[in-house]
Every structure is written in structure tokens, then in C-alpha cells.
């Protein structure tokens, strides 16, 4: 997370974004990350640092399914809007279908709430359903039309984020920046949703991080077999 919100969280620890007000703060989830020498001293410090983004946002879009969403929204003055799959929320995904076609791994779903539409993503898995819901809700709050949102989501892709590399029609190759246990587990579960006959996992760990991160990632090998 060298850019974007991940970078903002790091800067907040050193008060480098003091005085900046964000139009919209988006919360996806919170996991044991960025904790160790040179980063955050504890999970609580990390969570509190992350929450400061929403204390300086004019509007907040938050994942209603995440177990820390109550902590993140407590005592906020700005309006809070929700998205999700399981809990009642303002924009909700239903009837999710995971597909493997000649175009690769896709996912389609229906939205209810503010936006009622059929969404097709070429970035696979439940994690990207959540990401697209967050983007959809923020775009809606900024006045972007449902048609533009739908067309954009259908074509969006991010290099290094469940990025498919077309090598053969007999198997799929996916590259992902799964740099901790939470993201690696999410990746494995995403690929399992497409019911592969075999799943081969090749991964490494970034340097200058807590050794605990390596142990946690290694413990996930059994679910990829």
C-alpha cells in the first residue's frame, strides 16, 4: 500500500495530513497489518490512526459487514452511508454469481437500495464485489450516473490485483499483491469460488516487516491444496 489510502494512513501517524479535509472517506475492512517496528505499535493504534481519516471526511462510505464498522463510525459528525452483502445497508449486492468464461474469471450481481442495477465485473471474487460497491456508492454521492458507473465497473482492472495473465486455455494464471495473511486468505478463497480442479500457490514475503507476518502467511498453505 504505497499509494492511495494506505499511504494516507501512514502519513496520519506522523500528522502529515493535518488540515486536509477529504470529500469522501471509504472504509473497506481492518486486519492485523502495518504493526511492528517502524510501523504501528499495536492493533489499537493502527485502528485509531485509520479512524482519523473519517473524522476529517465530509461523507463516509462504510462496509456494513465488517466487524469494526461500529468502532469506525462512533461519534462521527459527518453523514455515514453503508454498503455490503449480508447486513441491511444503503447499497447491497444480491444474487452473486461467479463465472469462468473465455474472457476469464468474472462475477455478476444485482444491486438493491439506492442503485438498482445488474453489475458485471471482470475482477473476480467477493472482495471485488465489496470494492465495487464502495466505488459505486462514492460515485453515486458525487453525482455520477448509474449508467456511467455500470459501464466503468464492467471494464475496470488493476494491475497486480487478481490480475489474470492469459497463457493457456487449459489453466488460469493470476497475479496478486497479497502481502499479508488477510489478503492471501482472501485471494485463496476468491479462487476457490471458481471451483478449480487444482490450485497451485507461489508466494513470497516483503522484507523489513514483522516476522509474525511470515508465519501467518505460511499457515494458510493448507487451504490452497
PLM region spans:
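Single conserved hydrophobic/aromatic residue that forms the stacking wall/gate
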Residues: 1-9, 221-225
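Short, glycine/acidic-enriched loop or turn micro-motifs at the edges of active sites
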Residues: 32, 66, 178-180, 207
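Acidic, Mg2+-coordinating active-site environments of NTP-dependent enzymes
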Residues: 12-172, 196
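Structural alpha-helical scaffold elements that stabilize or flank donor/cofactor-binding regions
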Residues: 1, 18, 53, 220-221
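Conserved acidic residues
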Residues: 6, 23, 58, 176, ...
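Active-site flanking residues adjacent to catalytic metal/cofactor-binding acidic residues
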Residues: 62, 175, 203
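Switch II (G3) loop of P-loop NTPases
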Residues: 7-11, 173-179
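Active-site beta-alpha connecting loops in nucleotide-dependent enzymes
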Residues: 158, 184-185, 189-224
Amino acid at each position: 500500500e504505497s499509494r492511495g489510502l494506505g499511504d494516507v494512513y501512514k502519513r496520519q501517524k506522523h500528522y502529515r495530513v493535518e488540515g486536509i479535509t477529504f470529500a469522501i472517506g471509504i472504509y473497506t475492512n481492518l486486519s492485523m497489518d502495518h504493526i511492528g517496528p517502524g510501523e504501528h505499535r499495536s492493533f489499537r493504534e493502527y485502528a485509531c490512526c485509520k479512524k482519523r481519516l473519517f473524522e476529517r471526511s465530509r461523507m463516509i462510505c462504510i462496509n456494513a459487514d465488517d466487524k469494526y464498522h461500529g468502532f469506525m463510525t462512533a461519534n462521527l459528525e459527518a453523514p455515514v452511508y453503508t454498503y455490503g452483502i449480508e447486513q441491511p445497508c444503503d447499497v447491497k449486492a444480491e444474487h452473486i454469481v461467479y463465472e469462468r468464461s473465455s474472457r476469464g474469471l468474472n462475477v455478476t450481481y444485482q444491486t438493491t437500495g439506492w442503485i438498482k442495477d445488474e453489475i458485471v465485473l471482470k475482477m473476480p471474487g467477493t472482495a471485488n464485489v465489496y470494492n465495487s460497491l464502495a466505488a459505486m456508492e462514492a460515485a453515486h454521492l458525487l453525482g455520477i450516473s448509474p449508467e456511467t458507473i455500470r459501464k466503468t465497473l464492467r471494464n475496470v482492472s488493476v494491475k497486480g490485483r487478481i490480475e489474470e495473465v492469459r497463457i493457456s486455455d487449459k489453466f488460469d494464471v493470476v497475479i496478486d499483491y497479497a502481502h499479508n495473511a488477510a489478503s492471501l486468505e482472501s485471494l485463496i478463497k476468491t479462487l476457490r469460488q471458481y471451483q478449480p480442479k487444482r490450485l497451485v500457490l507461489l508466494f513470497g514475503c516483503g522484507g523489513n516487516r514483522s516476522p509474525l507476518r511470515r508465519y501467518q502467511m505460511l499457515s494458510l498453505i493448507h487451504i490452497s491444496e
